[in-house]
Amino acid sequence: MSEHNYQSDREVAEDPFLNYEASANQLSSNSRESTPRGSPWRAGMRSASLMTEPLEDSMYSDNNYLDNGVSFTKDENPLYSPSWPSLADANVNSMKSNNAIQEHKAAKFVSEKSLEKVSTADNNLVLQELENLRERLNQVELQLSERPSSYLGYHNNLSPYRSPNSYPSLLPSTHSPHSPAPLSTMQTALMRLRTYHPSPIILKPVEQAVNHAITLVNTSPSSVVDALCRSLAELCLGLVQEAIDASILSQQESSNSLDLVRHTPPLNYTSSVDSSPQRMASDSYGRPSLHLNDPFPSVDLQSNELSHHNVRTTLFSDDSRFHSKIHTHSTPPSQMYSAASHFRYRSDPSTRHVSNSTNKSSLHPSPTSLRVAHPIIPQRASPASQSFPSLQDTPSP
């Protein structure tokens, strides 16, 4: 019994996992029994089972003192000692696999980031090209917007781009049902524009914009870029249309032999082309309106009312100061005009030709007419004839 108890006590005493003091004092050739329970290799096993990163030198330089105060270096650590070859090999293999997984994840992350960077750079380049194209088109639009509104829409029937049925090659293609194909449409529009020989200020930016848009459509397969290019192509077509209209108008103006400065507003053909024979005398001399080619109203002593009406509407069509000063209460207007007209036309029939051939107003007879009408000069003493010189001395109200 005692022998059995001794044997059991010895087994208990020799077991390092049950009695710390016995295992610490008893040494044997067995490395498991000679190592205390709180030995650093156990802590190393626990840390190795939890770690996913490889061990660093700082673990051994900063944490040299472990549970029981025994210090180890990296070379003396039992984790790397050949006493546990299977455990060390397993830990090393697991750490290598973990490192391989981490390296694979890092490489995948870096490759994704690099692809994102490359795609972002390409997108920025395409957007920059589109922005440059927009700027060029805006310059052309600003140059064309300086023209008056009479240029735009004045010759809608002269261009094939106003209606889609007028030109078969400009019909929308099957690739895009909403907008015309930018390649064929812009090339056709540019060829059409060159036939009119427009100004280089308009032609050069349009050519550059069309070439850039065609290049972007060919080199950028993205749907967003394609849609942007098609929108820019439609804008370019509109600008080409306005340039063609302006070129047609400039050719028509040159064919009419009008001395106009280039890119100036056209003349109003309804009022200014045929208005040179009807130039007013008041425009040059500051006097009441009197048409040079209109004959002076016929005066007859038997029809004073008719002559009074004609002269009044011709000479004093506007409400000027002459109208209020001549029509005084002392002299009736009918007698005044009849006396003045009688004075002018009684002297000589050639007087009418002389007075109409000159650019002076009928209120101031020429010296020739005065010499011809010398026998009738005493008639100027009448009140009707004295009212005419008073016009120059009367101050303006």
Curated annotation (Swiss-Prot):
Keywords, comma-separated and alphabetical: Cytoplasm, Cytoskeleton, Phosphoprotein
Report the residues modified as Phosphoserine: 366, 396
Q: What happens when the gene is disrupted?
A: Abolishes cytoplasmic microtubule nucleation from non-SPB (spindle pole body) sites, but does not appear to affect the formation of astral microtubules. Fewer and thicker microtubule bundles, with microtubules curving around the cell tip. Cytokinetic actin ring displaced from medial region. Curved cell shape.
Statement: the UniProt record of this protein carries the keyword Phosphoprotein:
yes
**Where do the segments described as Disordered lie?**
1-44, 269-298, 346-397
Q: Bias regions of kind Polar residues — which residues? A: 22-37, 269-281, 352-369, 382-397
Skewed-composition ranges (Basic and acidic residues): 1-13
Where would you find this protein in the cell?
A: Cytoplasm; Cytoplasm, Cytoskeleton, Microtubule organizing center; Cytoplasm, Cytoskeleton, Microtubule organizing center, Spindle pole body
Gene Ontology CC: cell division site; cytoplasm; cytoplasmic microtubule; cytosol; equatorial microtubule organizing center; interphase microtubule organizing center; microtubule cytoskeleton; mitotic spindle pole body
Mainly localized where? cytoplasm
Q: Which GO terms describe its biological process?
A: interphase microtubule organizing center assembly; microtubule bundle formation; mitotic cytokinesis; nuclear migration
Q: What does this protein do?
A: Acts together with mto1 to promote nucleation of at least a subset of cytoplasmic microtubules, by recruiting the gamma-tubulin complex to the interphase microtubule organizing center (iMTOC) and to the equatorial MTOC (eMTOC) during anaphase. Does not appear to be required for cytoplasmic astral microtubule nucleation from the spindle pole body (SPB). Required to establish the eMTOC, and thereby to tether the cytokinetic actin ring.
| Binding partners and assembly | Interacts with mto1; the interaction is direct and required for efficient binding to the gamma-tubulin complex. Interacts with gamma tubulin complex subunits alp4, alp6 and gtb1.
What is this protein called in UniProt?
Gamma tubulin complex adapter mto2
Q: Which organism is it from?
A: Schizosaccharomyces pombe (strain 972 / ATCC 24843) (Fission yeast)
- What is this organism's lineage? Eukaryota, Fungi, Dikarya, Ascomycota, Taphrinomycotina
Q: Which gene encodes it?
A: mto2
